[in-house]
Amino acid sequence: MKVVAMKKIIQLIFVAMLAIGFGSITSAQMSGPTKVVYHIDDAETQGLKGLRNIRNHLDVSPQTTIIVVTHANGVDIMMDGAKDKKNSVEYAPLVGALKSRGVRFEVCEITLKNRNLKKDQFILDTDFTPSGVVRVADLQYKDGFAYIKP
C-alpha cells in the first residue's frame, strides 16, 4: 500500500514539474516578437532560396528577429563577389538589403579554419561565431528561436 501511494506522489510531482516547465517555455515563446534562426550550410542548394525566404518572411512579418547562421559551404553566400551558380545572381546585394532590415548574418569560424578562409574574404559587416552548429543550438534552446532550414 505504501509503495503504491509513493508511486502516485512521485507521478504527481513529475506531472507538476512538466506542467511548470512547459508553461515557462510556452510563455517565453509567446512573449515579444517572433525570433527565427535560418540555418544555411550549402550555398548552392539553400543560398538564393534562403535569402528569398527571409525577404518574404520580413515582408509578411517585419517585426521578426532573424539571425542567419552559416557554416560549411553555406558560408559562400557571405563571401565577397560570390554568386549563385545556377543564375549568376550576386549574393552581396541581397544580403545587404536584408541587413538593412535588421537581419544578422553569422559565419562559422571552424569553417574558416577548415577551408583556409580569411575574414577579409567576406562582405562587409559579416559577423562571426566560434561554431555555427553550437550557435544554432544555443539560439534554439537558450534563446527560444524557431529553426528554419531552407
Q: What is each of the regions a protein language model found here?
A:
Residues 26-150:
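Secreted/extracellular ectodomain signature
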Residues 2-3, 147:
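Short hotspots in intrinsically disordered terminal tails
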Residues 3-13:
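Bacterial N-terminal signal peptides that target proteins for export
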Residues 1-2, 26:
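Signal peptide-directed secreted proteins
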Residues 13-21:
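Bacterial N-terminal signal peptides
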